[in-house]
Amino acid sequence: MSILVVDVGTSGLRAAVVRQDGSVHFLNYESCRPDTPSSGLVEFDPQKMADAVLRVCNATITQSKNSDTIDAVGITNQRASTVMWSKSTGKPLGPALGWQDLRTVFDCITAASEHSIKLAPNQTATKAAWMIQNYVVAKNLDFSDVRIGTVDSWIASVLSNNKLHVTDSTNAGATGLCTLDASSWSERICDLLKVDVSMLPKIVKSTGVIGNATALPGSPPIASLIGDQQSSLIGQGCINSGATKITFGTGGMLDVFTGTTSPTKMQRSENGSYPLVAYSDEQTTFWAAEAIMLSAGTNIEWLRDDLQIISTSQESHEIAMQVNDSGGVVFVPALFGLGTPHWDYGARGTLLGLTRGTTRAHIVRAVLEGIAHRGADMLEAVIADTKLSVTSLRVDGGMSQNLMFMQSLANTTGLNIEISPVTEATTLGTAFLAGIAVGTWPSINQATSTTKPAKVVTPTEKLDRAQWHEAVTRSRGWIPSLSSLDF
């Protein structure tokens, strides 16, 4: 019994087979990077994404046909990116807006000042409103023929030959358009933004059969939709209160499972984390809290592509290990500002403590340690907001393979670091939820029991957090106009 997983990320997408023992096979990947037509704008071509999804799915199915029977399909995706397409033809009505797109910043400010609605530009709400005005109203299109959805909705439509128009509660909760429990659309918010509720998808549970992938051989049932970070949370077995993971990709996302008690508001908490739906089944909605690092792996790319002091991302480990410490150098990884707990969009990357004796090894090590310090910042913020006890930290993403970085994370947090056996744990999470729906596993506990840490890194020393906090203070407010923004 096997599950086909479709994982659509920000820079690429993949398909793979997950077997009953939790092992991942026949992975096929295609790069699918967004376009940036000008500063602050992030778009992608939905049709190119759809074509790529079908290619990787068909490749994986072909490779697995002699060894695996596909029992179900699970879909996991970048959250909040917004697609608009025709109900009658299933074709896109214009470029999709990526979650990083900032063209609606002033719409968010207006929503807060005039209507007391707190929205962020990385949510779907104002993107959908912008698309309606620019793709529908401006072209005098028929409102009844318009569908709007996040990437999970779009891929479900593609795989079902335009039969399904659905999203799950984890994705709905990231739109800014739904009710507090993420079970239905808020008519008040939709009315204020002039988003017609009839254009939006039906909100379904994260696990459960919702239709068939008739665009694929055998038409397997689609049995799970879930946002990528929540999928990673489940994929690393974080299904008990206080269980915590960090995914280090382009940015860094820390999520802690908080249980079944719903939050009193779906807004940023006092220490900069956000409540969100972890996943939902027929009986229960489970909750989590999330902290965000705006820049993680991008700092390594900066060392490699711009400063050119490392040749490959993997070399950052080798170079950093040439010295015992950073030689007093501190790097604040704020290339795009600071997320949790500060939320200072005007902060900028800061390199302090340079001397004539500073080498590239010191700088590379300082960059890795700076990202680790940001991980500790996020952890402290989430603990303060949730009042939960966190006893270990599970980690996935490309940077989880850098053992020097993993050691720095252990030393800054004081926790054991449990490294995921699968770099992209998102693949496992949605597989588990789809498998539960069709009987591959009898329960979430049984499913997650199949995955164990590939390695556990324990703290060996305590890195200086006082000097770190001083460095962060110096990095903040560099661009005052951006620092004043509050979403």
Residues of each region from the PLM?
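N-terminal glycine/serine-rich phosphate-binding loop of ATP-dependent small-molecule kinases
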Residues: 1-93, 110, 142, 218-224, ...
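Active-site core segments that coordinate phosphate-bearing ligands/cofactors
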Residues: 4-5, 105-123, 129-165, 179-187, ...
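Short glycine-rich loop/turn motifs
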Residues: 12, 79, 200, 274, ...
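Gly-rich Lys/Arg/Thr-decorated short loops/hinges at beta-loop-alpha junctions or inter-strand turns
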Residues: 32-43, 111, 166-173, 355-362
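Short beta-strand-loop/turn "lid" adjacent to the catalytic site in phosphate-handling enzymes
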Residues: 62-98, 120-122, 156-179, 204, ...
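Carbohydrate-associated surface elements
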Residues: 101
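A conserved helix-loop-beta module that forms one wall/lid of the active-site cleft
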Residues: 187-208
